[in-house]
């Protein structure tokens, strides 16, 4: 492993000027803000924001452009993740880190004639510690499914959480649980759906890729082991994919709720790990996008501990190093961020949620 220094100096040496962001606070009354999802819920062509807060009984959304608040579902408990697929929303709730205390309720929300009114929830499954929901066209047939990654196995207990951790999916309409794999073990905190319709998982045992074969079975491949520290401080926590020009890289938070931002680049069929920052406290979200349109993706990483910040990492092509700047310094203990063009100007923006706040960082 090679550690890269963190440079906080300005300006960046890249040919294109760095992106500039304007901060907009959308909400300050959330409790336990955990996930933000971008979706056009009222079908007006403008992306709206779903704000999932684990300490609230209501799943709410904010209507673009004025960010008027609406309730999607009431009477919820310990919500942890949701995903939009077609005209439906799949919601995971009744969550606990301890499997024995986690119901792992999975429900489908459906709108009535007026999508601005609360949607109707129907239970489809109970999988303890259901934690990460994502949409993926796993079989490449144009029929996406919902992937559900549990946090731990059903018998796992703190602090080691040793057990086989289920990864499953549901076909819309049928909504029957189908198993992808139980090969991962320990905490599986993050997943990412690749352009090739595969699943990347970040867990105590590192980074793994799951791809469906033509026969429908799933093949598991180890990409990297993540943080080499002993279990349970080992492995990876969150993962995303970015590009520097045409070269692909992986970006991770490591270990679980960890302090490190790591970048993996592929050389000679092996993924080399570089820690570009080790100062995070309770790292919890990582994303990539080309914010300044120079052909290189930047990395967005947020953490929930002090000083409650979101960092932006840009690659300095001349110096061959990552340079850190502040997207939010002290005002956002980010549990999750999402990237989308929220104002229709063609530039990717950032939305982050954490604690009581939901913010939009407008890329100008």
Residue ranges, per PLM feature:
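Beta-propeller-forming repeat regions
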Residues: 15-364
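Bacterial N-terminal signal peptides
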Residues: 5-14
């Amino acid at each position: 492993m090679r550690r890269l220094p963190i440079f906080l100096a300005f300006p960046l040496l890249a040919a294109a000027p760095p992106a500039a962001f304007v901060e907009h606070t959308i909400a300050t009354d959330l409790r336990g803000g955990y996930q933000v999802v971008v979706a056009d819920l009222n079908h007006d062509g403008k992306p709206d924001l779903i704000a999932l807060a684990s300490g609230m009984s209501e799943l709410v959304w904010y209507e673009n452009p004025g960010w008027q608040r609406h309730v999607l579902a009431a009477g919820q408990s310990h919500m942890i993740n949701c995903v939009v697929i077609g005209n439906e929303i799949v919601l995971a709730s009744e969550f606990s880190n301890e499997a024995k205390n986690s119901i792992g309720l999975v429900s489908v929300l459906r709108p009535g004639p007026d999508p601005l009114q609360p949607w109707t929830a129907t239970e489809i499954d109970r999988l303890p510690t259901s934690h990460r929901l994502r949409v993926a066209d796993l079989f490449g047939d144009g029929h996406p499914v919902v992937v559900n990654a549990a946090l731990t196995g059903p018998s796992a207990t703190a602090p080691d959480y040793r057990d086989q951790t289920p990864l499953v999916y549901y076909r819309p309409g049928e909504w029957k649980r189908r198993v992808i794999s139980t090969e991962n073990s320990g905490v599986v905190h993050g997943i990412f759906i690749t352009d090739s319709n595969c699943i990347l998982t970040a867990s105590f045992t590192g980074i793994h890729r799951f791809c469906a074969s033509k026969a429908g079975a799933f093949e598991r491949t180890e990409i990297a082991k993540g943080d080499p520290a002993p279990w349970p401080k080992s492995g990876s926590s969150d993962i995303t994919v970015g590009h520097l020009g045409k070269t692909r890289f992986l970006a991770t938070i490591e270990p679980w709720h960890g302090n490190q931002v790591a970048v993996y680049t592929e050389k000679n069929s092996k993924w080399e790990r570089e820690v570009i920052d080790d100062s995070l406290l309770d790292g919890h979200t990582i994303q990539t996008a080309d914010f300044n349109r120079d052909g290189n993706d930047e990395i967005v990483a947020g953490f929930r501990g002090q000083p409650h910040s979101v960092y932006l990492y840009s690659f300095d092509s001349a110096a061959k190093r990552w340079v850190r700047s502040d997207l939010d310094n002290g005002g956002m203990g980010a549990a999750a961020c999402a990237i989308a063009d929220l104002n229709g100007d063609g530039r990717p923006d950032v939305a982050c949620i954490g604690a009581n706040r939901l913010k939009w960082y407008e890329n100008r």
